[in-house]
Amino acid sequence: MTSLIRSNSWGSFVQTITSSSNRLYIGWFGLLVFPLLSLATVAYITAFFLAPAVDIDGIREPVAGSLIYGNNIISGAVIPSSNAIGVHFYPLWESLGLDEWLYNGGTYQFVVFHFFLGVCGWMGREWEFSYRLGMRPWIFVAFSAPIAAAAAVFIIYPIGQGSFSDGMPLGIQGTFNFMLVFQAEHKILMHPFHILGVAGVFGGSLFSAMHGSLVSSSLLAETAGSESLNNGYVFGQEDETYSISAAHAYFGRLIFQYASFNNSRSLHFFLAAWPVIGIWFTSLGVATMAFNLNGFNFNQSILDESGHYINSWADILNRADLGIEVMHERNAHNFPLDLA
């Protein structure tokens, strides 16, 4: 009798977890996703408001990132783990107590690891839900692009640089600081993979805007002229709601014939693939720069017939990068050895 009750309870639990008719699909991955993301969110908000200063450079000069220490929404951040910790895994039980753990930035690792595992689980949950519904797996493939970006920035880059103190601070101003320092140290703007990522993101935005405007402009009229086109649409209807041939003809004449798609599947695959591939490349670029395989440096690359270099915009950019680099962690650097 007891085993029967346990069997029924387990079956009911499995049915609840894996049912695709729930208002919110849970899934087996969801058992990991929701606790992990909840812990990361609570820890982040708490640290953003209340965390003490963190000795990010490992030189006993702590940096405050929480609101209680006078920061605002723009300047506030969860400060990365101390350079004294390096790339060591630093849970609470590895410290002498909570005060030391907070001082060394243990909160940063806590938030980053729980968040990253949570979004990886979310990607698995997307695959699982698609599988339950008999759908193809392209949704989770597309979501792999931001997962790859998160892995590159939060995991691979700090490991490649030898310390989680080089990770991106979890705040608005901290993000921009990370970007400027990344450019100064790695010449990311001159890296081909970053250029492909920019083309992917901005190109994807352009293509999405073009597609949305074309669809909205070629809706099939099912109503009288005095009525809204929306009144002729029934949610979930099998009939097409817009004329792809009309949109194709318009765009083909606006640009040239072969610039448009006359196949809906090809069109939407292109809209999905373009930004995803671009972000994949950017993530790969950040992962390579983590190990100092940097972007191009054209400093002093133009020479006259006597062998003297001629200043160019590349030299101006290089000088700006050097200025940013010596301003960064200025108390930890030994000027001018950092410029060598």
From Swiss-Prot:
UniProt keyword annotations, A-Z: Calcium, Chlorophyll, Chloroplast, Chromophore, Electron transport, Herbicide resistance, Iron, Magnesium, Manganese, Membrane, Metal-binding, Oxidoreductase, Photosynthesis, Photosystem II, Plastid, Thylakoid, Transmembrane, Transmembrane helix, Transport
Cell location: Plastid, Chloroplast thylakoid membrane
Annotated cofactor note: The D1/D2 heterodimer binds P680, chlorophylls that are the primary electron donor of PSII, and subsequent electron acceptors. It shares a non-heme iron and each subunit binds pheophytin, quinone, additional chlorophylls, carotenoids and lipids. D1 provides most of the ligands for the Mn4-Ca-O5 cluster of the oxygen-evolving complex (OEC). There is also a Cl(-1) ion associated with D1 and D2, which is required for oxygen evolution. The PSII complex binds additional chlorophylls, carotenoids and specific lipids.
List of residues binding pheophytin a: W122
Major place of residence: plastid
Binding site for [CaMn4O5] cluster: D166, E185, H328, E329, D338, A340
Subunit structure: PSII is composed of 1 copy each of membrane proteins PsbA, PsbB, PsbC, PsbD, PsbE, PsbF, PsbH, PsbI, PsbJ, PsbK, PsbL, PsbM, PsbT, PsbX, PsbY, PsbZ, Psb30/Ycf12, at least 3 peripheral proteins of the oxygen-evolving complex and a large number of cofactors. It forms dimeric complexes.
Misc: 2 of the reaction center chlorophylls (ChlD1 and ChlD2) are entirely coordinated by water.
Record protein name field: Photosystem II protein D1
Source organism (scientific name): Amphidinium operculatum
Gene coding for it: psbA
